[in-house]
Every structure is written in C-alpha cells, then in structure tokens.
A protein has these predicted regions:
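Extended, histidine- and acidic-residue-enriched regions that form the cofactor-binding/catalytic faces
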Residues: 1-97, 101-288
C-alpha cells in the first residue's frame, strides 16, 4: 500500500436516543454508511488511490439527555481524534477524512479543531467533511436538489417542515428505513410533528421534526445529493487543492464551542487573580 496514495476514512458518531421509534445507533449507522460510500466513491473516481476504512468510533459530545445516550467530555473526543490522527500520520498516511452522523455544534467544532491541529502539526490533510455539510443541510441548502430527485417533488409545506427537521425526524427516520428498516418502530407513522422552538415547554418526545413523513425514497435522494458533495471535497483534496472552505464550518471560531473552553476559561481566571494578588502585594510593599 502506497500511503501517499491512500485515503483513510474515520466514521465517528455517538450512541444517542432518537425518540421512541428509532434505534440508539442512528448517528453511528449513518457515519458507517457515509464513510463506506465515501471510500467506495474515492477508488472509483481515483483508481490511483487506495481507501482504508477505519472501524467505527461510537463517541460524541453534546447529546440530548435521553435513555441510552452516551457522551464524553469535549476534551476527551478532541484528544482521541488528535491521537488517532497523529498515529496515522506517523505511520505515513497523508489524507484522513472524518465522516459523522452527529450534528451538534460542540461535536462539529471538536472534530474540526482536532483535524486542524493534526493537519498543521504533522503537515498532512485531515478533515471533518460532515460538519460544514450538516450545517448546510440543516439550513435547507440541499432541499431543492433533494426535491428534484424524488418521484414527486416536495410541496412548499413539506419544504418548510424539512427546514425544522433536526433530530429523529423526517431525514433520520428515512435513513434508518433505508439502512436498518428492521430497527424502525411501526409507530413512526403516527408520530406528530414536533418543532424545536426556544422557550417551548412540555415533555420532550425524543425527537424534533416530522418522522411520519419518512420514506426510503427520501433517504436515497438525500444520499445522492450528500455523497456528491462529499465526493467533490475529497476529489479536490486528493488533487492538492485547499478544501478548508468546505471543511471548516461557520461556527468553528466560536470560542464557547471549543472542546476545552471551560478549562481554558478557568485557567485564565486563575491567572488573572494570581496576577492581581501579586500586583497588590507589590503595591503594598512599595508604599511602606
């Protein structure tokens, strides 16, 4: 295997509750699927390259607090990915791509931060492809492309519902109907729409979106659109082009989302207090 001509794919996503109708492994299953598809597409488009598919890593942060959700601290996820990326780089691999099915802001930034760290320190290309893509998807950027691939285009009301589909709803239920139909509860068809709104009260049903709208056809259409985007980023990267605009999300520079923000904030406060105490002692000494 020529490591200069090998793309490594890391599927990384947590185990998390997605409502009463879906399995705990929704994000993890999605990550495995997209990593496999990305690897397959890479060797098709670039027969001069090999693809190495790393075992799935069922770890993530900032999860909904539901039975079965398993999270770690942001620093743990960050350190783990930095460690794996560094090890792969030391073994000579130059191209590493993370695929994730989890779209929480802190998770995205932790993965991106780890990739930036390894890329700069080891002079390789390591990218989280899914983060920026997830944000664009949630903003509704791909709705028209998906609609055009369906046997019956989406109506305006359906497009509006899709823009509010965040967790365990239309898209994720559709993906499980495609990937793991035996793990989808029949009751999804009778679940009411649940819109995520700030300040809303009441019992959380475990999902935000419209699971009753789900279909395997919708999943297939969305997969085609997303894989095209993933393939484009990988192709650019393997061709030596800068893909940071495609792989660094708009939320990357938000300090409060950084994986070790609280630790650094506390250290900063302690250093400030220590400095003030020293200045006070110096002042007291000088005025004597």
């Amino acid at each position: 295997m020529d490591k200069d001509k090998t793309a490594v794919f890391l599927p990384v996503s947590p185990i998390e509750g997605h409502g009463p109708h879906l399995p705990l492994g929704v994000d993890y299953f999605d990550a495995l699927f997209f990593a496999d598809k990305a690897a397959e597409l890479t060797v098709q488009k670039r027969p001069d390259f090999d693809a190495l598919l790393y075992p799935g890593i069922p770890v993530g942060i900032q999860l909904y607090k539901q039975p079965g959700s398993l999270r770690v601290e942001g620093g743990v996820l960050y350190d783990m990915i930095v460690g794996l990326g560094t090890s792969l780089a030391l073994w000579g691999f130059k191209y590493i791509f993370i695929l994730s099915g989890h779209g929480s802001p802190k998770d995205i930034v932790a993965l991106e931060s780890a990739c930036v760290k390894v890329s700069k320190k080891r002079k390789i290309q390591m990218h989280n492809i899914s983060g920026s893509l997830a944000i664009r998807f949630l903003k509704g950027e791909f709705i028209e492309k998906i609609s055009n691939r369906l046997s019956e285009p989406l109506k305006e009301r359906e497009k509006e519902l899709l823009r509010k589909d965040i967790h365990g709803g239309w898209w994720e239920t559709s993906m499980m109907l495609k990937l793991k139909p035996d793990l989808v509860g029949d009751g999804y068809k009778s679940l009411q729409d649940n819109e995520k709104e700030r300040g809303s009260s009441g019992t959380f049903p475990g999902y935000f979106g419209s699971p009753a709208m789900a279909s395997a056809e919708f999943a297939e259409a969305s997969v085609e659109v997303l894989i095209d985007e993933v393939g484009s980023v990988i192709e650019k990267c393997l061709s030596g082009k800068d893909v940071s605009r495609e792989t660094i999300s708009p939320i990357y520079n938000m300090l409060i989302l950084k994986p070790k923000f609280r630790r650094h904030l506390l250290m900063g406060i302690l250093i400030t207090i220590k400095s003030l105490v020293i200045l006070w002692l110096i002042y007291r000494f000088l005025i004597r």
